[in-house]
Amino acid sequence: MKIYLVGGAVRDKLLKLPVKDHDYMVVGATPEQMLSLGYNQVGKDFPVFLHPKTGQEYALARTERKTAAGYGGFSVDAAPTVTLEQDLLRRDLTINAIAQDDAGNLYDPYNGIADLEKRILRHVSDAFVEDPLRVLRVARFAARFHGLKFTIAPETLSLMTTLSRSGELEALTAERVYLELDKALSTDNPQVFFQVLKECGALAVLFPEIEALFGVPQPENWHPEIDTGIHTMMVLEQAAKLSDDNSVRFAALVHDLGKALSPKEHLPKHHGHGQKGLPLIKSLCERFRVPNEYRDLALLVCDQHQNIHKITELRADTLVKLFDKADFWRKPQRLEQLLIACEADSKGRKGLEQTAYPQADYLKQCFAAASAVEVKSIIAQGYKGAEIRTQLNVKRIAEVQAVKGLQPIEAK
């Protein structure tokens, strides 16, 4: 029995990046031997064991043979005779096919170290096309390592294109697609994930709502970048710079889906695109089982981003209605999330990336003023039942009016 550190831990150590997870490969062992040493078996499809003390994963060396469509369509051979080289051959990229023994010796049969130095994402073998999930994984690695100047090898991108056209992507489960999406949103450059998917044809298959935005024009005076798809990528890039909250990044990604539905005769204008996008967001979230908190924020941003941009033009009572509708009273963090997404939208335009967004501070002031109204003071004045709610609303509007520098509206 011989144990090797494999995969991301070796790769990230060589890149001098923080190592989060340690995965190990065991050559020359049987499940019975692992169990006798106190390891706990957790793998259903192939033998994976947890170390009795550290809880780290130890997988028996294995080979895989394609037997059916999709991510799980493989038969596995994890016999003790499977070699280190055979196991590494089944992996997706050369940079993920490097092993290290307990003495620190590196094993690199497929030249992953050279590709790390060249900053290239390259497939290990043509068996790459047997697993459609690898299209998403490579796109995610391209996003994750974009700051290190990694690029995808042309021959690998060609295989990704072949996979995207094969119909195999449709066999991926919603959970697997969403997991890769969420991991991609967590990177410093999530827009690269979608740009790569578009380049290889996978965006149209998995995220047609986003693909549909490319080629849709916007008014050049507001959007020097013109193309809605390019704008969306720029907004996502800005959102990643402004916040590490994935729900904000997701909202930025889908905020303009409705523009793809604008009648051609009305282009480049997009009247009511916020409201038109709501059903598209609901459908996408249902399809990939996106968490409710992501969905709800995305719907709010889609519905209200145009109002937020022109917030100083809105009446005080309209603002209080917005606070009610968005339930900011109970979820004040949602206001911050909304404003960050809207700021990203404003900055996600060619040449306007450094522009200030004063709307955020203004709306925060309005909300702080409205929030300062206390229910107990209204009750102390003798109001009861429905009157309390009415007076609370009146006083909140008055406080917002004061922020706007206007005279309070007469109570009715």
UniProtKB/Swiss-Prot annotation:
GO terms for molecular function: ATP binding; CCA tRNA nucleotidyltransferase activity; cyclic-nucleotide phosphodiesterase activity; magnesium ion binding; phosphatase activity; tRNA binding. Its EC number is 2.7.7.72, 3.1.3.-, 3.1.4.-. One of its GO terms (biological process) is tRNA 3'-terminal CCA addition. ATP binds at residues 8, 11, 91, 137, 140. CTP binds at residues 8, 11, 91, 137, 140. Magnesium is required for nucleotidyltransferase activity. SUPFAM superfamilies: Nucleotidyltransferase (SSF81301), Poly A polymerase C-terminal region-like (SSF81891). Keywords: ATP-binding, Hydrolase, Magnesium, Metal-binding, Multifunctional enzyme, Nickel, Nucleotide-binding, Nucleotidyltransferase, RNA repair, RNA-binding, Transferase, tRNA processing. Mg(2+) binds at residues 21, 23. Disulfide bonds: none annotated. It catalyses: a tRNA precursor + 2 CTP + ATP = a tRNA with a 3' CCA end + 3 diphosphate; a tRNA with a 3' CCA end + 2 CTP + ATP = a tRNA with a 3' CCACCA end + 3 diphosphate. It comes from the Bacteria. Its cofactor is Mg(2+); Ni(2+). Residues 228-329 form the HD domain. A single active site specifically recognizes both ATP and CTP and is responsible for their addition. Monomer. Can also form homodimers and oligomers. Catalyzes the addition and repair of the essential 3'-terminal CCA sequence in tRNAs without using a nucleic acid template. Adds these three nucleotides in the order of C, C, and A to the tRNA nucleotide-73, using CTP and ATP as substrates and producing inorganic pyrophosphate. tRNA 3'-terminal CCA addition is required both for tRNA processing and repair. Also involved in tRNA surveillance by mediating tandem CCA addition to generate a CCACCA at the 3' terminus of unstable tRNAs. While stable tRNAs receive only 3'-terminal CCA, unstable tRNAs are marked with CCACCA and rapidly degraded. PANTHER family: MULTIFUNCTIONAL CCA PROTEIN. Comprises two domains: an N-terminal domain containing the nucleotidyltransferase activity and a C-terminal HD domain associated with both phosphodiesterase and phosphatase activities. Belongs to the tRNA nucleotidyltransferase/poly(A) polymerase family. Bacterial CCA-adding enzyme type 1 subfamily. This is Multifunctional CCA protein. It comes from Shewanella pealeana (strain ATCC 700345 / ANG-SQ1). The gene is cca.
